[in-house]
């Protein structure tokens, strides 16, 4: 055999081997994160399995390398697995046409080092309804990048959603960012989701009155909007915005205009790198149902609960709308969660206050199937957002959330799967401190608060005597029904009593076994001790330290 023949033979072996190795390398890349829905339940799939975001959002000005050490330290102390971090248009394109993604490089690299996933928040045309994060060359050139006009034709603080060049350049910068994320992260999937703009809408102005906006306002309402957002004028099914929606016309129109603007950006970004995308909402008063017409009392045009359907119609490349919760009242939080948890809208809380009172709502949200929760300002920058959040900027701020996240962290994958399967429920202690009931398959749980761990309230001489440390509401419990008669529950500062319901209604029942423990890295339950006797005779009394129990129940014949 000649040397040429040997060389040709080696080539025939090596070439297929190279293709095989290349295919193996490609197959090793993690699956792209995606949001999935099944039977009205949702899951954020990360690395091919449901993922529970134990998240925190950094302060607005922590998006620079020098601030990151204080961010990672706080997330570690919080037992968090995800960081929400803003990337601003002014930051990446300070000079028109020149892009700088060096901070994004640093952020992604350090996130991997700290084993943290990322949700990128795009501060573009709108941040808290304003133009603060636009590049200077956009902010002040109102001829090229027009602002909204009021009824008198005067400029207002927010830029117009009908400004074609503003949209085109916001979209270009966003696409550049998505291209860069794909370039640096497609083999790792550190970045799992993107928020497009931030708390859009306008305070004090119902809509844009500029020439383009006025012309659009007088046009027929798009059929896709009418199909989802029920007309407010009786007997009308088509027409312009006023004809179809009457007193609601201006708010609905502004919502459609902004949602359409966001859709253009999201669609272009997903064409480059198809990560899940969402919008967040500065909320209106949740107790106003049915919602009243806009009266200057909230940000018109944002994805408030009453216009989610308009956003669904105008922005199909946005996966869901999410509430920013800075209302500590338990009744309002429940209304908000109920409004945003929909079969067509995944529940997530991208921002909420970082004051201690908010920590208990993590149990309620995760029990309701939320894919993630993120207290705002969860870093050690010496900046407090009190009174919306905590007075503290150190570990005292993190601690209430660290305790709750600490019980979910070992079972984060299991919990996300159970929620996707519709097995979970949750409650948070109400401001009225009243007991709450949770109906599950065959069983009912009654959750009460401020109880002593031993005995019943009627045993007390002073019926106004309560367990110390419960002066402020802080209890919560999340349940997962993992079998016909078996539950995993996590909670704190609460008493849980089970009784038969549904098929077990009226049947004598009792606790078969109660184990305290946790899940190991492989998802296997590890028992630490069995509860019985005094620890179960008066219900399951969860202490101030968050605790995980595995409970098995049974019925018997009288």
Which residue stretches match the model-derived regions?
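N-terminal carbohydrate-binding accessory modules
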Residues: 29-81
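The substrate-binding groove and active-site-proximal loops of carbohydrate-active enzymes
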Residues: 53-63, 86-104, 152-172, 242-259, ...
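Aromatic-lined substrate-binding rim segments of carbohydrate-active enzymes
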Residues: 68-142, 258-272
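Polysaccharide-binding and catalytic clefts of secreted carbohydrate-active enzymes
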Residues: 143-308
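Aromatic- and carboxylate-lined catalytic core of secreted/periplasmic carbohydrate-active enzymes
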Residues: 363-500
